[in-house]
Amino acid sequence: MSAFTPASEVLLRHSDDFESARVLFAGDLQDDLPARLDTAASRAHTQQFHHWQVLNRQMGDTVRFSLVAEAADVAECDTLIYYWPKNKPEAQFQLMNLLSLLPVGSDIFVVGENRSGVRSAEQMLAEYAPLNKVDSARRCGLYHGRLEKQPTFDADAFWGEYTLDNLTIKTLPGVFSRDGLDVGSQLLLSTLEPHTKGKVLDVGCGAGVLAAALASHSPKVRLTLCDVSAPAVEASRATLAANGLAGDVFASNVFSEVNGRFDMIISNPPFHDGLQTSLEAAQALIRGAVRHLNSGGELRIVANAFLPYPQVLDETFGFHEVIAQTGRFKVYRTIMTRQAKK
């Protein structure tokens, strides 16, 4: 996170506006501008654990990772700089949360790439902080307004759910496949055998659908789930609870907070970080799996067929096999053997 994103570069064109401001940074924080911008004081709130990791090293306790921001997170701030995410319901959850805490009269800045739909911020905030576009550069828009009225915010109102077979899947804005099971996960699920036993880790668990479906027909599995996303962690916990299933669920940047070894690691790894295509998480998953699999343990992942994972699997484990595929997706399987690179 050394290079600035286009959105941050647009903000830097207005750096003089923030020198005497007490700024809260929030939203899709994909670089370390919150730690580097010259302000009277800076705080940050993020729902993404990997963003928190980067900023925490430079900002300490003034950056917080959680699903919902609290009053202490915006303490004494008079300015919000909000990075618009690609997901509009996610933006609504976060902005209603933050604006319900900031004092009336606060300066509100919203910045984002045009293709992310940042223009819809004007309509979303019209009742609370009418926005004007103050800059357009680097294919981004920067909007400014003042908070005229605090919205009421009820996090419970943002929960959704859908049914998969006999399972109830709980979801929140920002969680992958919020509106139903995606095709890739469906293909991976079709390969999971009933009566699986042992310790299973679901990396990038989303709403917890893979782990819940596995446990529903393999009651002897011991589940561990992790994700970088606070909404995903909370949704997975709620999914397990709704179906009477047990499991350990926590935030982790791939394996950063994972301890121990497992008999199976399953994942539908992301390859989009915000609007950018990123293979880093999936490559870290494959390479790091050797340190978290028992001998004979299995890594099973689903991915878009065009992604270059076979090479990484072969470099790391010595081999791989494709156990299911469609025109768009493949399910890869490999085993922890002595030839795997530890």
UniProtKB/Swiss-Prot annotation:
Q: Where in the cell is it found?
A: Cytoplasm
- Cystine connections: none
Q: Does the keyword Methyltransferase apply?
A: yes
| Keyword Cytoplasm found | yes
Alphabetized Pfam families for the sequence: MTS (PF05175), MTS_N (PF08468)
Query: Which molecular function GO terms apply here?
Result: 16S rRNA (guanine(1207)-N(2))-methyltransferase activity; nucleic acid binding
- Main subcellular localization, coarse class? cytoplasm
A single Gene Ontology CC annotation of this entry is: cytoplasm
Task: Quote the InterPro entries the UniProt record gives.
Answer: DNA_methylase_N6_adenine_CS, Mtase_sm_N, rRNA_ssu_MeTfrase_C, RsmC/RlmG, SAM-dependent_MTases_sf, Small_mtfrase_dom
> Keywords for this entry?
Cytoplasm, Methyltransferase, rRNA processing, S-adenosyl-L-methionine, Transferase
* Catalytically driven reaction(s): guanosine(1207) in 16S rRNA + S-adenosyl-L-methionine = N(2)-methylguanosine(1207) in 16S rRNA + S-adenosyl-L-homocysteine + H(+)
Give the EC number(s) listed in the UniProt record: 2.1.1.172
Q: What domain of life is recorded for the organism?
A: Bacteria
Q: What class of enzyme is it?
A: transferase
Q: Which family does it belong to?
A: Belongs to the methyltransferase superfamily. RsmC family.
Assembly and oligomerization: Monomer.
Q: What does this protein do?
A: Specifically methylates the guanine in position 1207 of 16S rRNA in the 30S particle.
Q: What is this protein called?
A: Ribosomal RNA small subunit methyltransferase C
Protein species of origin: Klebsiella pneumoniae subsp. pneumoniae (strain ATCC 700721 / MGH 78578)
Question: Corresponding gene?
Answer: rsmC
